[in-house]
Regions:
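N-terminal Rossmann-like NAD(P)+-binding domain of SDR-like oxidoreductases, especially those catalyzing
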Residues: 4-200
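Pocket-edge positions in alpha/beta enzyme catalytic cores
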Residues: 74, 113, 161, 209, ...
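Short-chain dehydrogenase/reductase
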Residues: 114, 163-171, 207, 211-215, ...
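Short, solvent-exposed loop/helix junctions and linker helices
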Residues: 23, 115-118, 211-215, 249-252, ...
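Short, flexible, glycine-rich and Lys/Arg-enriched loop motifs at helix boundaries
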Residues: 55, 195-217, 227-247
């Protein structure tokens, strides 16, 4: 990859069109970003196939912001259906979240991930070109850095071979976008490389809603605490202070605000493509997260140690100074607030039929 060393100066005029398409907008990060966008006065059009989300989130968004966004239940792989949305709506920009995202599942079923994650992106880029939509904000991931030994990672950290097919789709996605931007006189893109989003909205109305069994650390722990079930820690022999993997956890509302900041940045920047790490810069181990949940919930978690999982990275956390300087963005939420909001959401979610 070129790491975006070639920067093309491009004129950007403030568009009179203010509709933002948010793919995967009923998902975890997507729904929080939709709320943030709407609270900033932007019109949002959601495209989501509901494969890992619920239509009930629409009414939850309405409870928070006072109105429902426009919603289309469409699979992005179906380019004809997506084209109808572009024909009907006056679109200014696209924020692309929709993707399969489970590292372990991608190892077992890689072709599912390559087909969905890459075809959907290519379809969007083709339609953006066809309908002269010039701004794309891409949901990338720290997985593009692979199992790097350089921490904290900066945007200049080499993009290595991915540790999972999911990570590979993010690397390929970034390359596809870079090639599309370099071949276009008008297309601009910002790539946000998230670290580990956690927590839930401060209203308690939206949070991580897994369809089926949860697969991410925070909801698994919160549900295990409430059900008094056993929590499995995968790996205790990593080269970390307590032997368990270390991650940079960022509150989902901080992540949502980074998207709004990036969208505003694209309006005024002459840079054709850029990448930003979005994290807190602090690494916490699995055992440290467990202790925080136990301290706040006043409950003891039953844990067992299992073998390492294929595709898991040993340790990674962000250097987000570039985002702080260029996007004027700073994370606000502490680890304690992340955990508390997760527990509040879990209590709310468990009382609902969905």
């Amino acid at each position: 990859m070129s790491y975006f060393r070639i920067v093309t100066a491009r004129k950007t005029t403030m568009s009179t069109k203010k509709k933002v398409v948010v793919t995967g907008g009923l998902g975890y990060i997507g729904s929080h970003t939709v709320v943030e966008l709407m609270q900033q006065g932007l019109e949002v059009v959601i495209i989501d196939n509901l494969c890992n989300s619920s239509v009930h989130i629409l009414s939850q968004i309405e409870e928070i912001v006072g109105k429902k966004p426009v919603f289309y239940q469409i699979d992005l792989v179906d380019i004809s259906a997506v084209r109808e949305v572009f024909e009907k709506e006056d679109i200014d920009s696209v924020i692309h979240f929709a993707a399969h995202l489970l590292v372990n599942e991608s190892v077992v079923n890689p072709l599912k991930y390559y087909r969905n994650n890459l075809v959907s992106l290519i379809n969007l880029l083709e339609l953006m070109n066809e309908f002269s939509v010039q701004k794309l904000l891409f949901s990338s991931s720290c997985t593009v850095y692979g199992d790097t030994k350089q921490v904290p990672v900066t945007e200049e950290t080499p993009v290595f071979k991915a540790s999972s097919p999911y990570g590979a789709t993010k690397i390929m996605g970034e390359q596809i976008i870079e090639d599309a931007v370099n071949s276009s006189p008008v297309l601009k893109s910002v790539l946000l490389r998230y670290f580990n989003p956690v927590g839930a909205h401060s209203s308690g109305k939206i949070g991580e809603l897994s369809i089926g069994k949860p697969s991410h650390l925070f909801p698994i722990i919160s549900q295990a605490i409430e059900s008094e079930s056993i929590f499995m820690v995968f790996g205790k022999d990593y080269h970390t202070p307590d032997g368990t993997p270390v991650r940079d956890y960022i509150h989902v509302q901080d992540l949502a605000s980074a998207h709004v900041a990036a969208l505003q940045h694209m309006e005024k920047s002459s840079c054709s493509i850029d990448a930003f790490n979005i994290g807190t810069g602090n690494g916490f181990s699995v055992l440290e997260i467990i202790r925080e949940f136990e301290n706040i919930s006043k409950k003891k978690l039953k844990i067992t140690f299992e073998e390492r999982r294929e595709g898991d990275v040993e340790k990674i956390w962000a250097d987000s100074n570039k985002a702080k300087e260029k996007l004027n963005w700073t994370p606000r939420f502490s680890l304690e607030e992340m955990v508390r909001s997760c527990l509040v959401w879990e209590n709310y979610r468990s009382s609902r039929d969905w």
